[in-house]
Regions:
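Generic enzyme active-site microenvironment
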Residues: 89, 164, 209
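Substrate-binding/active-site clefts of carbohydrate-active enzymes
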Residues: 4-159, 167-184, 195-203
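Conserved alpha/beta catalytic core and glycan-binding cleft of carbohydrate-active enzymes
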Residues: 159, 185-228
Length: 228
């Protein structure tokens, strides 16, 4: 059984909010284990703008958000979960990033307050109808390398057991609208298989879950490749 966890809610006691930290959550692992839970999916905890957020506004992918704890405390939480026989999955957001991300700042059109046309990582405008913050161009070799490096880092440095990918329907450069975005997209399949290869090569037991919601033919091909 897998539960999805957001620290601030989980560590609330009565009318008083606990510190809402990863350290506080670690103290509750015996209780979680007693429920029959064998996997925890953490909502996005890579550094995000502000301190009060669900985490779907990422800005720095190689750092865990300081509002919840230190690098050592995150690692301790995962280690303690593993001692209890609980896998730890991370919700990752690679569809977009905020304007605080260095890649956005490096190539920025200040006149129009948006991504510059020569930005090698972000689209000026999202080609799909799921435009949130600044849209990554997953056809760019630089973006692909960045995402794969980050996945490998999370698996090796923090020992995560897998990932839940947010909004993977947006991993495409093909133009679409609300009625066509779910149609089979071969280029999107290639991109996701490439990311899965990195995950699987780094840790053959790691899982990769997609928030995808596309047509059955695309979903089936991704499932056959090993994704959930």
């Amino acid at each position: 059984m897998c539960i999805r966890d957001r620290f601030r809610d989980f560590t609330q006691t009565g009318s008083e909010l606990a510190t809402g930290t990863i350290k506080e959550a670690t103290k509750h692992l015996d209780y979680i284990k007693s429920l029959g839970v064998n996997a925890i999916e953490l909502m996005p905890i890579q550094e995000f703008d502000g301190n009060n957020s669900w985490g779907y506004n990422p800005c720095y992918y190689f750092a865990m958000d300081k509002a919840y704890g230190t690098k050592e405390e995150y690692k301790q939480f995962i280690d303690e979960c593993h001692k209890q026989g609980i896998a730890v999955l991370l919700d990752v957001v690679y569809n977009h990033a905020t304007g605080s991300h260095p890649f956005a700042k490096l190539y920025w059109n200040s006149k129009e307050s948006k991504t510059a046309k020569n930005n090698p990582w972000f689209n000026v405008d999202a080609p799909h109808p799921f435009s949130v913050f600044h849209d990554f161009n997953h056809e760019s070799p630089l973006v692909r390398e960045f995402v794969k490096r980050n996945l490998k880092f999370l698996l090796e440095e923090y020992k995560f057991d897998g990932f839940r990918f947010d909004l993977t329907k947006g991993f495409t450069q093909n133009k679409s609208n609300e009625s066509t975005a779910s149609n089979k997209d071969d280029s999107r399949i290639v991109i996701l298989k490439d990311y899965y290869k990195t995950v699987n090569t780094t840790n053959p037991n790691a899982v990769m879950i997609l928030e995808h919601f596309c047509n059955l033919d695309e979903e089936s091909e991704l499932a056959k490749a090993g994704m959930k």
